[in-house]
Amino acid sequence: MPSLSAKNQAFFNEPACERNRSKDFKVRKKGCSQPPMPGAAAGGCAFDGAKVALQPITNVAHLIHAPLACEGNSWDNRGTASSSHMLWRTSFTTDVTEFDVVMGHSERKLFKAIREINEAYAPAAVFVYATCVTALIGDDIDAVCRRAAEKFGLPVVPVNAPGFVGSKNLGNKLAGEALLDHVIGTVEPDDARSSDINILGEFNLSGEFWQVRPLLDKLGVRVRACIPGDSRYLDIATAHRARAAMMVCSTALINLARKMLERWDIPFFEGSFYGITDTSEALRQIAGLLVKQGAGPDLISRTEALIVEEEARAWRRLEVYRPRLQGKRVLLNTGGVKSWSVAHALMEIGLEIVGTSIKKSTDNDKERLKQMLTNDSRMSGATTPRELYSALSDHKADIMLSGGRTQFIALKAKMPWLDINQERQHSYAGYHGVVELARQIDLSIHNPIWAQVREAAPWEMAPARGEEMSEEEALL
């Protein structure tokens, strides 16, 4: 098995990434994302990326081989949802201390932790995550995992993604490699069908995928594995028998999609379930790929019939909100695939995009966005808080959609704000999701509180002309 260093170097040569193919060797070695700053890696390191990409696997115990802070900083930082098992919500850590490091007890402590988890919880598998401290002291988690798997008779998967090796995006890809090396293809299903698909890079934020799965069920399309959102270990172990795949977030798991194509001939495409048009196009592409892979040709006609029905229902429900939102200006401060997928959904509602962030977006994402926006100046990289505040306080936008980190900028500018990132509480995917998005924006913009907070405070208002305050009133 190749070393961690060799794997990391391989990620800088990704044939399925157009941006990567366009670079020369020197530029390619630099990678796409800036590495985390020393001392400020919490929430943006490779370990965090791997944890985010794998933790939604619900019936697996996720064991962090590290000091306590690594698990404390990474637990529950993404609002995924589960339809059954809740084991993934439990934190497990070996709590490596200075004494363990000095005395060399950390590997023994890891083995003991795996045994205790197996006895107390009987998980479908245990995922063991390497971190900076345990990787630097040379703990061989692969050997410990092999021994534990033999001893206890359950899958124990090493995830070698210590934080210092790179960015969060690299950690996503290392998580995909762990699935390829130790999980996918380890179980042969006895119920494989010609209409099985995989959904890659879908995290089921706030239960979003539950609004899409019923559409696929109506078409007779079965989701063999949704990686990682609301998935089970067995689903992923049998994912190699799917006939097609949809990539939702290519920056995270593009290596997984490409290697599943190479090993098991599973074709894939990149799509989005945000907005009416993109949801319909995703359903069409799923049907088209499955028919090419052997599904019945009537799947395409049934898909078109479903699209007509669902689109008509969605547009009818949007009629309530479109007159109230027509022409309203939105500042979209997100990144990645959402830079174009959410922007397209907002434009369908009738909103005007005055600016959108393209941080973490690929060249393909940027090209899609350029086709939607007539003015490239609306696209920006990492926007500073001062620039965001200026855009809002000057009334260049009526609402800002972003993550929780920038919500206080909007509140300081006394402007509406809506959470569009992973911490959100509402589902915006599929036909129902775009209606919910319109409803939440309408509620935010037309909330009467904004008119009240923009009024001057009583003590800021000058006395009316001709009125003089008495000495007693002044003292009061």
Swiss-Prot record:
Annotated GO MF terms: nitrogenase activity
Q: Does the keyword Protein biosynthesis apply?
A: no
* PROSITE patterns named among the record's database cross-references: NITROGENASE_1_1, NITROGENASE_1_2
Pathway in which this enzyme or protein is active: Cofactor biosynthesis; Fe-Mo cofactor biosynthesis
Q: Might you name a Gene Ontology BP term for this protein?
A: nitrogen fixation
Q: Where are the transmembrane segments?
A: none
Question: Which InterPro entries does its entry note?
Answer: Nase/OxRdtase_comp1, Nase_comp1_CS, NifE, NifE-like
User: What keywords tag this UniProt record?
Assistant: Nitrogen fixation, Plasmid
Family that this chain belongs to? Belongs to the NifD/NifK/NifE/NifN family.
Its biological purpose is as follows: This protein may play a role in the biosynthesis of the prosthetic group of nitrogenase (FeMo cofactor).
Designated name of the protein: Nitrogenase iron-molybdenum cofactor biosynthesis protein NifE
Name of the gene this protein is made from: nifE
